[in-house]
């Protein structure tokens, strides 16, 4: 049986992921304590089911510590994949504000005057919500490492659905490569497996004609391709990824996220990410995401 275990931060998109699984024919259960998954899998297998999707989160926090043990047991008989969805605190606060829902760990009284809470209160933010989010992040951190992580902070719903569909795909392939451009001034992507810094490359930003463009526009491409340093770094990154890709495949990875960062995430990192994606598309499944441009492809 194929089992997809979804966990992660409240408000990060687990319901969207579970809906994608359900649309794909999975038998789906939300908020099931981990210790009950093996029994459910046995029952469903006896009934002829071949695909199971389970979401478990902080609402079942007493059973979260049993997840690694449960996954080990399940993998003796089933094909098990773990998916961990996360998002920045700022993004989660905004989502809760829009939906007006209460976080599972929110406390209304007796909040400590932590530095984060004092700063948040000065900005008029809900300190109980921020504290709950950070508490949840700490409690869930042991589950993030063994799972495939997706940071949904800037993802549109349709892009998240596309990633989930690729993640659960039954089509034979070794691994899916995600090349993600970003700007260091906005923070490093939390779901990156490899991070490359290209800030030392010549910057089109200082050309007033190129400044409003992106690394996908031909004038910027022409500028960067005329720089030997840019081509050399792109080749070095390509060679590194290609050399170590078999090791990630041998580690049973379904995804490998390669993040390319420049200062603002508009020119150099976008160009390098696109160049790498073009090369590796001939080798398998490739996705591209330009975080600061809010573009997925």
UniProtKB/Swiss-Prot annotation:
InterPro entries: P-loop_NTPase (IPR027417), RapZ-like (IPR005337), RapZ-like_N (IPR053930), RapZ_C (IPR053931). GTP binds at residues 57-60. Belongs to the RapZ-like family. This is Nucleotide-binding protein Rpic_0258. PANTHER family: RNASE ADAPTER PROTEIN RAPZ. Displays ATPase and GTPase activities. Keywords: ATP-binding, GTP-binding, Nucleotide-binding. The keyword GTP-binding applies.
């Amino acid at each position: 049986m194929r089992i997809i275990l979804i966990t992660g931060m409240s408000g990060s998109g687990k319901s969207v992921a579970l809906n994608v699984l359900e649309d794909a024919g999975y038998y789906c259960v939300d908020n099931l304590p981990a210790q009950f998954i093996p029994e459910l899998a046995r029952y469903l297998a006896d009934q002829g089911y071949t695909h199971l999707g389970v979401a478990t989160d902080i609402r079942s926090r007493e059973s979260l510590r049993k997840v690694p043990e449960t996954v080990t047991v399940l993998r003796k008989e089933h094909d098990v994949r773990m998916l961990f969805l996360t998002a920045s605190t700022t993004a989660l606060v905004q989502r809760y504000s829009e939906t007006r829902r209460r976080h599972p760990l929110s406390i209304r009284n007796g909040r400590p005057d932590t530095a984060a809470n004092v700063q948040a209160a000065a900005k008029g933010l809900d300190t109980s919500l921020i504290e709950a989010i950070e508490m949840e992040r700490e409690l869930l951190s042991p589950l993030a490492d063994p799972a495939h992580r997706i940071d949904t902070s800037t993802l549109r719903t349709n892009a998240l659905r596309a990633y989930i569909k690729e993640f659960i795909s039954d089509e034979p392939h070794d691994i899916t490569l995600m090349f993600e451009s970003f700007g260091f001034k906005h923070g490093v992507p939390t779901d990156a497996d490899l991070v490359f810094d290209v800030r030392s490359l010549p910057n089109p930003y200082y050309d007033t004609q190129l400044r409003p463009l992106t690394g996908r526009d031909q004038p910027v491409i022409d500028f960067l391709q005329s720089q030997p340093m840019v081509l050399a770094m792109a080749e070095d990154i390509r060679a590194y990824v290609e050399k170590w890709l078999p090791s990630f495949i041998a580690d049973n990875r379904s995804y490998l996220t390669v993040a390319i960062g420049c200062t603002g995430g508009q020119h150099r990192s976008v160009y390098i990410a696109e160049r790498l994606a073009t090369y590796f598309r001939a080798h398998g499944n490739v996705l591209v995401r330009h975080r600061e441009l809010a573009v997925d492809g």
